[in-house]
């Protein structure tokens, strides 16, 4: 099969397409950086004074190389095989109803792991499917090589109020909208 990936991602994509088992995927080094669709904090005011209908998301969305964040114990890294643009991405790109950088700054103040989200860029995207490449030390249900579809709800599994209904969680967020490192990227 022919692929369209280039650089460090090529080996990962080739292995996935060829059906490599998890142990083979785990042996492939992850790149230090990867391509992601981002909005920039420095452009938050670019649409000030404009009507919503006149704001063009294409002006604010950029394909940029970003550094691979450190993997938290309760996270996984996936090679994104498919993603989409939904209303969260459009809102992020026109900075409405508010700029998402406030969400990232607030998350950044919560913990060591949250601090990774407070960046001068926001890698957007609340939808993705892909293949697990790494899992954090506290991940129990998923393993390298699993094919996954990512749900946008970002919930603290240690918050008891979210166990029966994730919408009741005190810190429930939307992944790729209120968190960084979303699905419109090579890795997430």
Locations of the language-model features?
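Intrinsically disordered, low-structural-confidence terminal and linker regions
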Residues: 1-6
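A short N-terminal beta-strand-loop micro-motif at the entrance of redox/enzyme domains
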Residues: 12-29, 44-82, 121-123, 138
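Short structural boundary motif marking the start of a folded domain
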Residues: 30-37
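Charged, glycine/proline-rich intrinsically disordered loops and linkers
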Residues: 40-59, 96-118, 159-169
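Glycine-rich beta-strand-centered segment in the early N-terminal region that forms part
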Residues: 67-84, 97-159
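Cysteine-cluster motifs in flexible loop/terminal segments that predominantly coordinate metals
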Residues: 154-187
């Amino acid at each position: 099969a022919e692929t369209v990936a280039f650089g460090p991602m090529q080996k990962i994509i080739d292995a996935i397409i060829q059906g490599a088992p998890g142990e083979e995927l785990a042996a492939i080094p992850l790149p230090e950086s990867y391509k992601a669709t981002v909005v920039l904090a420095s452009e938050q005011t670019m649409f000030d004074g404009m009507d919503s209908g006149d704001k063009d998301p294409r002006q604010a969305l950029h394909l940029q190389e970003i550094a691979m964040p450190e993997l938290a114990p309760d996270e996984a890294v996936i090679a994104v095989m498919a993603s989409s643009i939904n209303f969260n991405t459009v809102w992020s790109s026109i900075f409405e109803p508010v700029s998402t950088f406030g969400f990232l700054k607030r998350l950044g103040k919560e913990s060591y792991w949250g601090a990774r989200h407070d960046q001068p860029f926001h890698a957007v995207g609340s939808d993705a499917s892909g293949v697990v490449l790494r899992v954090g030390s506290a991940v129990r249900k998923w393993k390298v090589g699993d094919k996954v579809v990512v749900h946008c709800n970002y919930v603290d599994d240690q918050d008891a109020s979210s166990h029966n209904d994730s919408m009741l969680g005190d810190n429930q967020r939307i992944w790729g909208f209120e968190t960084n490192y979303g699905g419109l990227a090579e890795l997430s």
